[in-house]
Structure formats: structure tokens, C-alpha cells
Amino acid sequence: MMDLRRLFKNHFDTKEISDDNMKKFAEVHLERLSANNGTAQFTAMITATTAAYTSYFGAIANEDTKFAIQQGLTVTMNNIVENFKNFASQKEGIVFGNFSKTSAEYQEFYPHGVSEYRQANLANIETLMTRFFAAAERHQAILGASMQSDAENLLTDFRIARKAQLEKIGEVSAQKSTTSTTRDVIENELMKNVHLIASMFIG
């Protein structure tokens, strides 16, 4: 005997159906409904399904666009981080040339050596950039204004890029939630259509 619970399951609500396959199925489904709508028996179904289709794939496109922008912002931020790492490494010679390696001034810049900067990550890079800028500002008279201004510009650029990246990540997350909700709508619409068509052609 057939398990009647299968009738109440939404067979479109599965990760095994990709977005592309969902799109193709919905398009073919709409084409066939339209081709067989000579007596307008499928008009309401076509209208509802078209609305669900448009809403869903509009959301997908929006999510893709925002994700692409987020990825671009991430590249920008990573480039700034890499530029700072190179900057801190290159300026070590100038700091060492003006202060001995055991001096308090040198330790302000490189308390754990140059490798600390080379091994920096997103968890500590802003702290290191802030520290380097503060030290360059304190010793500007000896090391020159350019080191201080370059360190400040890198710190400012990083903060702007990081803020923009995090904001876009938040937008992408919110858009994913919207897309998921919209996919539920078209999944339900397609399953409802299956039941309606079945009820129209019993036997």
C-alpha cells in the first residue's frame, strides 16, 4: 500500500535540486502550462508561478551581485594589509639605523621583531598598524614626517576597507536569508501546481 505521507511532502524542498535545475524546471513548467492553456484553465496557476519565479531569481541575481562586490572589497583590504606588511618590513632598516636594536625606541616599533608583522592576520593587523603609526608619530622629528603620514594613510585605508567589507558581508548574509525565503515560495508554488494538475486529471 502506498505511504500517503508522501502526498504531503514538498518534493521540491531539497538541496538535491540546485538553483539552476530549479530555474530550468520552472521555465519548462511555465512553457507547458502556457502551451496547454487554451481554455484558460491554467491562467491563475501561470500568474502565481510567474510571480514566484520572478521573485526568486531576482533575489538570486541580487545575492550574486552583492557577493561579487564583497569579494572585490576583500581583495582591496587584503592588498592594503600586504602593503602595510611590506612597509613595516622596509622601514625596519630606517628605525634600526636611527636607534639601536636594544633601544626603547626600536622596541616601540618591533617588540617582537619584523616577523610579527609578516605573520599578522585580520585578528591583530589593526592593532599592529595602530602601534606602528603611534610610534612613528612620537619619533617623527628623527624619522621624518613621511613615515608617520604613510603609516597613518595605511591605517586609515585599512579601517575604511574593513568597514566596507564587513558591511557588505552583512548585506550578503541578509540577502541569503531573503533568497532562502523566496525559494520556499517557488517550491511551494510548484508543489501546489503538481497537486492541482493531478486533481484535474485523476485517473
Where are these regions (language model features)?
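Basic/polar low-complexity intrinsically disordered segments
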Residues: M1-G203
